[in-house]
């Protein structure tokens, strides 16, 4: 049965939008005639164009500007949205289908009385007003907005200089020059989402660095990307970005095409490549002329390039603008004073990108300290989440303690078990694996600032770790990705990181894959494993989200050797090992009157430390391999540790060499030559005392000390297996130090001895430069006593004699 609306009902609906959305209208919707005046208003989620009556109300109230009605609607909307979850308005969310009144509740309209209903009387079922609309082309230089009525939206419309209301269509239209202004203002209305104008979907309204000065010109460029395919074309080509200022047209010979090229003011022909290049400011005219040729098909530059280099299409500049100096006065001086110039530049870049970037500096350039400084810049938005490989969780905690002394140590929360809280600290540090396990226990509110260490762990969007991380990253306001090995040769592995930082850049993976992964359609599906247009991709990433400096570029600012203390944990060791380690520590604490017994007890403690560290050592080596470190050295002392490392590498089919006390002298040189010549992943597993001299392994630039040794001279000799004549890179030295083990006492002693050597000129570098990042050495009397035992029990000759005997 169907009943038409009475004239009285129509009049009342036109007078007041809230009456049209009254509950009485909802109840009548089941039997009402399915006309636009009812169905499109009463049924939330109905697809189609905007309701005519809503547009009519917009015209009446927009033109009359009756304050009482507008005030009533705004007050009710505010009351409704108080309990509503925040709505993120992004290109991804607005790319969904257009709904005239989708999700629009009819709250607050139980009856038609004139005063507004108090918030307490608003039904709880539909607490948020949510309105979807779209921008569509209206004429050559204008666009219109198809959307239902919302009082706040009408106020925005009225503020646009080129506003025009069309009574015939009951819609508002605007000049393309004001498109940017309108979308920016609508982005601040949490209950409204407008689908972008066709061709402008990729435009990131919120990113100040990517705003075009002339939205109309940008819209025209975007339209060049539409409908460029010509089925009957006999000549096909494409435009490719070759520098920040120039594009290349890769196309076969055709007289008309060459004629167009020669007319371009910035034309340049390369005799070697036989390609034409042009300034970006000529792109619009170039494409417009080429599109006029019926037999020529030219693939345009992708939306992402137009968006990221928008200012270049207006007036081309060869040099990128230098980011302004960020104000770091509110950050701990201990941190800001320690930044090298290029690291300060990295912080400036991050701030200019509003805290969303991929920091892809080479290993050893201080990505950690830069990330901490960037996060500290946005400290008012904390709590902070740090996601890192399991082996470096505690290294991050120590780094925060060192660089941000204003942060209380007990406010740093390192998640070690799945049952631990993810939000109990101001700084929360978790591993990728644990984040995946806690995926089903999301935090009560999203993290606004997130650091993802070794973000290339997210390279496969199908993995559990990626599925757990991406939702957090999409809701975060600041996203700091760290990776020393961006997969530029495998662009498909970069896509998830691009999505995390700038999701609007490439909303669809297939578009990214066809442009940069040389996508091919095979019988079983699409293959995205290759690469294409890599120069353009590199330029695009550097312009929009990525900062990458190589060691060779900042060599003058770096020390020849950079030492890093990596704090590892003994969590996960079996109860027997743990009990033995604790027992050895207790025995040492008692003290000995007999020097021989003291030495023996110290060696027992050292041996149990090796057993307790094995798991953490293997985890760290695995992380280094996954991070892309193809060649490095691992020094250890105990046979148990050396055996465990080589066994693990063998099981993973990783090439390695091993040199220890049992390796014949004749074989050592052959093993070194094999390592030096290797072009694939290869790890040199070496004994600290048996392979610390006489070997040249400078094809690697990373040394990992899985165990400590209390003679710093031996450690320096081991470091110099790679830091020697022929080394063309800076050398990274990583010391793995475990709390609650003999390392607590060995490391302070090593520092003290090295300081003495430096003061007398016997060492050119201080091994304790980075030691502050590992504050293991407490000042309780028991620990000092054990340290003194290590110092007095062995002179250098005795140490070497005892330690050369592997247990």
Swiss-Prot record:
Which segments show compositional bias classed as Polar residues?
52-68
- EC numbers: 3.6.4.-
UniProt motif (Nuclear localization signal) ranges? 548-565
Q: Where is this region: Disordered?
A: 1-68, 98-124
One Pfam family recorded for the sequence: SNF2-rel_dom
Tell me the PROSITE patterns matching this sequence: HARP (PS51467), HELICASE_ATP_BIND_1 (PS51192), HELICASE_CTER (PS51194)
Motif stretch (DESH box)? 453-456
* Domain (Helicase ATP-binding): residue spans on this chain: 348-504
Which UniProt keywords are present, listed alphabetically? Coiled coil, Hydrolase, Nucleus, Repeat
**Residues annotated for ATP binding in this entry:** 361-368
Q: What does this protein do?
A: ATP-dependent annealing helicase that catalyzes the rewinding of the stably unwound DNA. Rewinds single-stranded DNA bubbles that are stably bound by replication protein A (RPA). Acts throughout the genome to reanneal stably unwound DNA, performing the opposite reaction of many enzymes, such as helicases and polymerases, that unwind DNA.
- Name recorded for this polypeptide: SWI/SNF-related matrix-associated actin-dependent regulator of chromatin subfamily A-like protein 1
């Amino acid at each position: 049965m169907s009943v038409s609306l009475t004239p009285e009902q129509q009049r009342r609906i036109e007078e007041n939008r809230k009456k049209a959305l009254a509950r009485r209208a909802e109840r009548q919707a089941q039997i009402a005639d399915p006309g636009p005046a009812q169905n499109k208003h009463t049924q939330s989620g109905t697809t189609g164009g905007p309701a005519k009556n809503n547009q009519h109300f917009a015209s009446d109230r927009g033109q009359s500007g009756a304050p009482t009605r507008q005030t009533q609607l705004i007050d009710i909307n505010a009351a409704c949205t108080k309990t509503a979850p925040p709505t993120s308005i992004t290109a991804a969310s607005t790319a969904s289908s257009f709904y005239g009144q989708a999700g629009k509740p009819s709250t607050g309209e139980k009856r038609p009385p004139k005063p507004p209903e108090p918030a307490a009387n608003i039904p709880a079922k539909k607490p948020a007003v949510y309105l979807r609309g779209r921008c569509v082309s209206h004429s050559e230089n204008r666009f219109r907005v198809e959307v239902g009525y919302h009082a706040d939206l009408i106020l925005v419309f009225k503020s646009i200089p080129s506003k025009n209301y069309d009574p015939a269509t009951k819609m508002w239209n605007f000049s393309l020059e004001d498109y940017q202004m309108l979308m920016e203002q609508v982005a601040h209305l949490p209950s409204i989402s407008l689908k972008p104008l066709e061709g402008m979907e990729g435009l990131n309204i919120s990113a100040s660095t990517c705003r075009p000065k002339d939205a109309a010109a940008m819209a025209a460029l975007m339209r060049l990307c539409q409908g460029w395919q010509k089925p009957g074309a006999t000549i096909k080509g494409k435009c490719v970005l070759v520098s920040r200022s120039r594009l290349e047209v890769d196309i076969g010979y055709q007289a008309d095409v060459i004629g167009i090229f020669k007319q371009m003011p910035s034309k340049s022909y390369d005799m070697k490549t036989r390609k034409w290049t042009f300034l970006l400011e000529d792109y619009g005219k170039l494409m417009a002329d080429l599109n006029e040729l019926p037999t020529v098909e030219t693939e345009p530059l992708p939306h992402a390039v137009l968006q990221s280099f928008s200012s270049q299409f207006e007036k081309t500049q060869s040099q990128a603008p230098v980011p302004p100096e960020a104000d770091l006065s509110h950050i701990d001086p201990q941190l800001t004073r320690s930044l090298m110039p290029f690291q300060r530049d990295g912080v400036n870049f991050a701030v200019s990108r509003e805290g969303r970037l991929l920091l892809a500096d080479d290993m050893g350039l201080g990505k950690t300290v830069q990330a901490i400084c960037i996060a500290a810049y946005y400290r008012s938005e904390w709590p902070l989440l740090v996601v890192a490989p399991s082996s470096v969780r505690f290294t991050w905690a120590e780094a925060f303690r060192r660089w941000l002394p204003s942060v209380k140590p007990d406010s740093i929360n390192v998640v070690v078990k799945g049952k631990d809280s993810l939000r109990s600290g101001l700084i929360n540090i978790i591993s990728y694996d644990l984040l995946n396990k806690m995926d089903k226990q999301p935090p009560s509110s999203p993290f606004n600032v997130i650091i993802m260490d070794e973000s290339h762990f997210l390279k496969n969007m199908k993995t559990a770790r990626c599925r757990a991380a991406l939702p957090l990253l999409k809701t975060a306001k600041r996203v700091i990705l760290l990776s020393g090995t961006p997969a530029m040769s495998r662009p498909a592995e970069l896509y998830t990181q691009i999505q995390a930082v700038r999701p609007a850049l490439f909303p669809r993976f297939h578009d990214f894959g066809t442009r940069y992964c040389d996508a091919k359609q095979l019988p079983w599906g699409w293959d995205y494993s290759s690469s294409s247009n890599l120069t353009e991709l590199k330029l695009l990433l550097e312009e929009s989200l990525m900062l990458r400096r190589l060691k060779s570029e900042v060599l003058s600012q770096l020390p020849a050797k950079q030492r890093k203390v990596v704090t590892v944990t003994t969590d996960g060791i079996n109860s027997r090992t743990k009990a033995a380690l604790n027992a050895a520590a207790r025995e040492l604490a008692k003290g000995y009157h007999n020097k021989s017994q003291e030495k023996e007890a110290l060696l027992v403690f050292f041996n149990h430390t090796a057993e307790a560290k094995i798991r953490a050592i293997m985890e760290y080596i695995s992380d280094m391999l996954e991070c892309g470190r193809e060649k490095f050295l691992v020094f250890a002392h105990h046979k148990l540790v050396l055996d465990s490392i080589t066994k693990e590498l063998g099981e993973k089919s990783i090439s390695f060499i091993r040199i220890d006390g049992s390796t014949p002298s004749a074989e050592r040189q052959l093993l070194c030559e094999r390592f030096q010549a290797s072009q694939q992943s290869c790890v040199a597993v070496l004994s600290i005392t048996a392979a610390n001299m006489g070997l040249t392994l400078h094809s690697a630039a990373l040394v990992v000390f899985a165990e400590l040794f209390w003679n710093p001279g031996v450690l320096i000799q081991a470091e110099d297996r790679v830091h020697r004549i022929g080394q063309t890179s800076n050398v990274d030295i990583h010391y793995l130090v475990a709390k609650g083990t003999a390392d607590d006492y060995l490391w302070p002693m090593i520092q003290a001895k090295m300081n003495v050597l430096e003061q007398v000129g016997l060492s050119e570098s201080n091994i304790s430069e980075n030691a502050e990042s590992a504050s293991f050495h407490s000042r309780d009397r028991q620990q000092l006593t054990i340290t003194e035992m290590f110092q007095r029990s062995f002179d250098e000759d005795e140490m070497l004699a005892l330690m050369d005997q592997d247990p």
